[in-house]
Amino acid sequence: QAEVRTVLLDCDLRRPSLARMLGIDGGMNLGACLRGDQEFAATARRIGPNLALAANREPALDAGEVFGGRYLPLALAAVDETFAPDVMIFDTPPMLLTHDLMSFAGHVDCVLLVAGAEMTTVKEIDLCERELATQTNVMGVVLNKCQHIGDGYGYDAYE
């Protein structure tokens, strides 16, 4: 939707990848912004008429402390004031590998849980969904990296 102002934040500070994937160079340092050391406007880059990206080019050694820190709510408020986005999307690290998301989840309106097919069990998805629901609203679950398509899928199944 072209009219929707969106801010995409690469909150996987341990293994940031969005700036690199999108071919954006420069001194992006979302960790410094979330620590209160840098203004959000100096961190973010517009990559379209209604899309801004904030990321880290290099891993942050203190990622756990950043998300549990006192500046996080202030930094998120600054994002809202600076860009007035309709939607903010936070790409976070895998929930089962770090506690970053649980420290962060209470500061967002909702989450969309993304699970890797053949990597994440139903039991793990259920556990993550229940834990997230204690902090915020869970919109749903997306199954990612799915390679198998069953016989009953597609238009041929209607014949």
Predicted regions and their residues:
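Short glycine-/polar-rich loops that comprise or flank the Walker A/P-loop
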Residues: 2-4, 108-110, 135-139
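P-loop/Walker-type NTP enzyme "switch/lid" segment
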Residues: 4-84, 94-98, 102-106
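Conserved beta-strand segments of the P-loop GTPase G domain that flank and frequently precede/overlap
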Residues: 9, 55-56, 86-92, 113-117, ...
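Residue-level marker for beta-strand->alpha-helix junctions and adjacent short loops that shape enzyme
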Residues: 13-14, 95, 118, 146-148
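Switch/connector loops and helix/strand junctions flanking conserved nucleotide-binding motifs
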Residues: 16-18, 62-64, 122-123, 148-153
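Short alpha-helix adjacent to the SAM-binding motif of class I
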Residues: 20, 78, 123-131
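Conserved Switch II/interswitch segment of TRAFAC-class P-loop GTPases
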Residues: 86, 94-97, 108-126
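Hydrophobic micro-sites
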Residues: 126-159
